[in-house]
Amino acid sequence: MEEPQAGDAARFSCPPNFTAKPPASESPRFSLEALTGPDTELWLIQAPADFAPECFNGRHVPLSGSQIVKGKLAGKRHRYRVLSSCPQAGEATLLAPSTEAGGGLTCASAPQGTLRILEGPQQSLSGSPLQPIPASPPPQIPPGLRPRFCAFGGNPPVTGPRSALAPNLLTSGKKKKEMQVTEAPVTQEAVNGHGALEVDMALGSPEMDVRKKKKKKNQQLKEPEAAGPVGTEPTVETLEPLGVLFPSTTKKRKKPKGKETFEPEDKTVKQEQINTEPLEDTVLSPTKKRKRQKGTEGMEPEEGVTVESQPQVKVEPLEEAIPLPPTKKRKKEKGQMAMMEPGTEAMEPVEPEMKPLESPGGTMAPQQPEGAKPQAQAALAAPKKKTKKEKQQDATVEPETEVVGPELPDDLEPQAAPTSTKKKKKKKERGHTVTEPIQPLEPELPGEGQPEARATPGSTKKRKKQSQESRMPETVPQEEMPGPPLNSESGEEAPTGRDKKRKQQQQQPV
């Protein structure tokens, strides 16, 4: 028995900082034998330090789960939350004195469970008001600090005495650049010591420079756009006269005006007549006369025309440039319709008269010498309008007395009368003269019929307009028009006009 006691004493020896006391003579409150009774259970209770177990007298405590238990102690109400749980092996052991061991501590059995007592929320009294919670103050930056980071789209808070200057500093980049540009010239002028007027000029100069640069850029952008269509226009203008071979610039302008006055059906016929203009309009210069004579000599074997074909086309550019009123056009159309009717009627009776008309034309054409050709051209360029009108009247009146009576039919006699005031008769005469050089039956007569066209330049502008428009529709029925009566007029009028021209030319050098 001593050995185990000695082992027990050694096992529960007094620690170095404690002193051993003998047990009290009084009986303990509980002993190990009292805890082992059938009506008692051992529970481990955990409670706060100020907990008074008297407040739970007569209260039910849950042995499983959690529950709020109300207690009252010394006139005060207390609320506690009680949590119960099952015991775990080896969690805790109880030492209790035993009478059998002489008052020594012995280990007791394990507890049935654990109870945790926690302080619950205290109930507020009905009369006591709730304490208001103060709102937290907004965050502020200390006065000595300056924020460097600014979020995108946000403005930094402004604090301290520099709040008045902050809006001026937070400006856009454009305003900052303008301020830098304007401040630089002001400082330079302040050093030089100039007046306030120069300062104003310096302030305005950078703005003006910026505006000028913008204007220049806009002009440069506009110039290539404008250069595109403008560059194409002269090319179109130059292409038009290349096909016509015009030597002078004045005729280039007159040509489109003439085209606008006439119908599109007459374009093909006009081009054939205008192509001969550059050879015939160069009458004033002596160098161009030679070129003109060479061009006409090449045409002689085909048509039998030397220089006399030139005055026929000389009138055309002036006629094309002058627009006509609608009333005159109507009269001309009526005259053209009248021209076609007598022309068709004269087809049958005139055909047998072709031979007698050729003899006077053939005899009169070669009478003019070659030396008189350039003189006749120079004489026509110099005299006035009055002399031309007189020549025209004389040239038209005289041939009527010679041959018109026996040879011409009744329909064509009034065409040779120049003194008549009616315009239809004049249209008929000029219409016949245009169709003559195209006829292939008589190569000599087209040259003879051209002096009539030579006499026309002296006529008024109205006659020129009428002759030009009458030529275009009349060229289509050339095959239907009778050859001999037209050639008869040209054969009769040509020799009389040439005789008078020769007399005038012979008198001038004397």
Swiss-Prot record:
Function according to Swiss-Prot or TrEMBL: Component of RNA polymerase I (Pol I), a DNA-dependent RNA polymerase which synthesizes ribosomal RNA precursors using the four ribonucleoside triphosphates as substrates. Involved in UBTF-activated transcription, presumably at a step following PIC formation.
Location of this chain's protein in the cell: Nucleus, Nucleolus; Chromosome
One example of a Gene Ontology biological process annotation: transcription initiation at RNA polymerase I promoter
Stretches with biased composition (Basic residues): 421-430
Keyword Nucleus annotated: yes
Basic and acidic residues composition bias: residue spans: 258-270
Cross-link (Glycyl lysine isopeptide (Lys-Gly) (interchain with G-Cter in SUMO2)): 270, 314
Keyword annotations of the record: Acetylation, Chromosome, DNA-directed RNA polymerase, Isopeptide bond, Nucleus, Phosphoprotein, Transcription, Ubl conjugation
PANTHER family: DNA-DIRECTED RNA POLYMERASE I SUBUNIT RPA34 (PTHR15484:SF8)
Miscellaneous section: It is in an antisense orientation to and overlaps the gene of the DNA repair enzyme ERCC1. This gene overlap is conserved in mouse, suggesting an important biological function.
Cross-referenced InterPro entries: DNA-dir_RNA_pol1_su_RPA34
Gene name in the database record: POLR1G
Modified positions (Phosphotyrosine) in chain numbering: 80
Record PTM N-acetylmethionine, positions in chain: 1
Skewed-composition ranges (Low complexity): 372-382, 394-407, 436-452
Name of this protein: DNA-directed RNA polymerase I subunit RPA34
Region of interest (Disordered), residue spans: 1-31, 120-143, 203-510
Superkingdom per UniProt: Eukaryota
Keyword Transcription: yes
Any Pfam family the entry gives: RNA_polI_A34
Protein family per UniProt: Belongs to the eukaryotic RPA34 RNA polymerase subunit family.
